[in-house]
Amino acid sequence: MSLNIRPFLAGNWKMNGTRESLGELRAIATGVSSNSGHLFEALICVPATLLSRAYDTLNGESLLLGGQNCHFDDYGPYTGDISAFMLKEAGASHVIIGHSERRTVYQENDAIVCAKVQAAWHAGLVALVCIGETLEERDNNKVMDVLAQQLEGSLPDDTTAENTIIAYEPVWAIGTGNTATSEDIAKVHYFIRDKICSRFGDEGNKIRLLYGGSVKPSSAFELLSIPHVNGALIGGASLKAIDFLTICDVCRKL
């Protein structure tokens, strides 16, 4: 953690959740509000089909809501896609962009990610930009090269701490139960911090850097204690209020 940066916990429900799941969301919101939520910020990115209903359910609670992806255009003939403006209208304040599953399954490259970031800003959303290496890239000692390329290509020149959050998610750790070592995470987050400070000046010191990759209640304290880790991008552990709020409690106590 960094003392001068307010921690941020982001939950990504992925393609999970129905109307019945809104009870868990409400429990998370209540827990965040009563769990010294002013000490940190919490976000849940629900499926687009739940976003509007989730917004109405929370009715002004301190829990933030986000989308999991957006198109790079504001509108148009893109069957099945959702624009950033649509997410904003439905109640989102943030949107995940460039998640490893989008980069690998849908072959979204840095240029597409960058265009989506700009679309998110245009709609008034904060972009949560994901970067990370594959197992093959890790085994070939290309981690820093890959991250440098993704940072350069995915972030527009007018990136600020107000419009962007960065999440480092080693692809090989997502949903596998594996996590990088604390030493490796510290090195990577220091590298990211150095890169964004070199490019964006002092603004780079203010941008929140999250770690994502099998973040669980049992690993939260160790991960959130690492220097330059300003929060977490949480997958499966965000689906249940008891798990997500346990991580929130760890964050509160640090």
Curated annotation (Swiss-Prot):
UniProt entry tagged with the keyword Transferase: no
Single GO molecular function: triose-phosphate isomerase activity
Enzyme Commission number, as recorded: 5.3.1.1
Residues that bind substrate: 12-14, 175, 214, 235-236
Family under the similarity heading: Belongs to the triosephosphate isomerase family.
Function: Involved in the gluconeogenesis. Catalyzes stereospecifically the conversion of dihydroxyacetone phosphate (DHAP) to D-glyceraldehyde-3-phosphate (G3P).
Subunit structure: Homodimer.
Protein name, as recorded: Triosephosphate isomerase
Species of provenance: Bartonella tribocorum (strain CIP 105476 / IBS 506)
